[in-house]
């Protein structure tokens, strides 16, 4: 049975452009990166986070004043990997707009709400889910206790990030994240995870990147 990732990569379209030096071919994602569009797709893990961070840093170096658009369709994943992307979004100079296409769950929802104020969007049929971090451990009792303390510390830090970007109280965030909380795009806007639900690209495309 073929690797589904390999099959997927073989299906990525190529775009051919005419230049003064002849034809140049790009895969579709590289071509969209030229337009300052980044895709956060699939589970959040170290390899994926490294690629996203590299793209953010590259686009900052290319033009530190021009917005970057981040399209998110992710079920979430590793907390530390997601925080690497989050910290880089806050670190770089360009404003980063975020748009949920499909789903933004767990760390995906944190990245969605971490976009620049008034530049956080969702398509109307997307789903957003927030919850507290989870983990399973085995070993000596002392080690299990240390891991539990680290999970609680991460939970507190994630809650603080949601408070910062949603405007909700710490108690409201703590209650919302106690269990899996699924939100429609409209409910996510009311909660402060996004700024607006959009079904058409704005006439002024600047906040979404051209």
Swiss-Prot record:
Keyword Glycoprotein on entry: no
Q: Can you cite an annotated GO cellular component?
A: cytoplasm
Note one Pfam family from the annotation: CLP_protease
User: Active-site positions, per UniProt?
Assistant: 106 (nucleophile), 131
What's the catalysed reaction? Hydrolysis of proteins to small peptides in the presence of ATP and magnesium. alpha-casein is the usual test substrate. In the absence of ATP, only oligopeptides shorter than five residues are hydrolyzed (such as succinyl-Leu-Tyr-|-NHMec, and Leu-Tyr-Leu-|-Tyr-Trp, in which cleavage of the -Tyr-|-Leu- and -Tyr-|-Trp bonds also occurs)
Q: In the record, what terms sit under GO molecular function?
A: ATP-dependent peptidase activity; ATPase binding; serine-type endopeptidase activity
Q: Record's InterPro entries?
A: ClpP, ClpP/crotonase-like_dom_sf, ClpP/TepA, ClpP_His_AS
Its BP terms in the Gene Ontology are: protein quality control for misfolded or incompletely synthesized proteins
SUPFAM superfamilies linked: ClpP/crotonase (SSF52096)
Its localization reads: Cytoplasm
Q: Which residues form the signal peptide?
A: none
Tell me the keywords, alphabetical order.
Cytoplasm, Hydrolase, Protease, Serine protease
Query: Which Gene3D superfamilies does the UniProt record give?
Result: 2-enoyl-CoA Hydratase, Chain A, domain 1
CDD domains assigned to the protein according to its UniProt record, in alphabetical order = S14_ClpP_2
EC numbers for this chain:
3.4.21.92
Which major enzyme category is it?
hydrolase
Q: Please give the function described in this protein's UniProt entry.
A: Cleaves peptides in various proteins in a process that requires ATP hydrolysis. Has a chymotrypsin-like activity. Plays a major role in the degradation of misfolded proteins.
Q: How does it assemble?
A: Fourteen ClpP subunits assemble into 2 heptameric rings which stack back to back to give a disk-like structure with a central cavity, resembling the structure of eukaryotic proteasomes.
State the protein's name.
Answer: ATP-dependent Clp protease proteolytic subunit
The species this protein belongs to is Bradyrhizobium sp. (strain BTAi1 / ATCC BAA-1182)
The record's gene field reads: clpP
């Amino acid at each position: 049975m073929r690797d589904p990732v390999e099959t997927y990569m073989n299906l990525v379209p190529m775009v051919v452009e005419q230049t003064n030096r002849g034809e140049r071919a790009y895969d579709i994602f590289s071509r969209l990166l030229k337009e300052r569009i980044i895709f956060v797709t699939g589970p959040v893990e170290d390899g994926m986070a490294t690629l996203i961070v590299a793209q953010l840093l590259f686009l900052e170096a290319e033009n530190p004043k021009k917005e970057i658009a981040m399209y998110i369709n992710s079920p979430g994943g590793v907390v530390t990997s997601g925080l690497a992307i989050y910290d880089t979004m806050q670190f770089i100079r360009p404003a980063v707009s975020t748009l949920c296409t499909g789903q933004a769950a767990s760390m995906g929802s944190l990245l969605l709400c971490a976009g620049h104020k008034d530049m956080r969007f969702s398509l109307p049929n997307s789903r957003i889910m927030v919850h507290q971090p989870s983990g399973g451990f085995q070993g000596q009792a002392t080690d299990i206790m240390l891991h539990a303390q680290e999970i609680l510390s991460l939970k507190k830090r994630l809650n603080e990030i949601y408070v910062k970007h949603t405007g909700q109280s710490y108690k409201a965030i703590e209650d919302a994240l106690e269990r899996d909380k699924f939100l429609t795009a409209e409910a996510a806007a009311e909660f402060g995870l996004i700024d607006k639900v959009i079904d058409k690209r704005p006439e002024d495309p600047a906040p979404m990147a051209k």
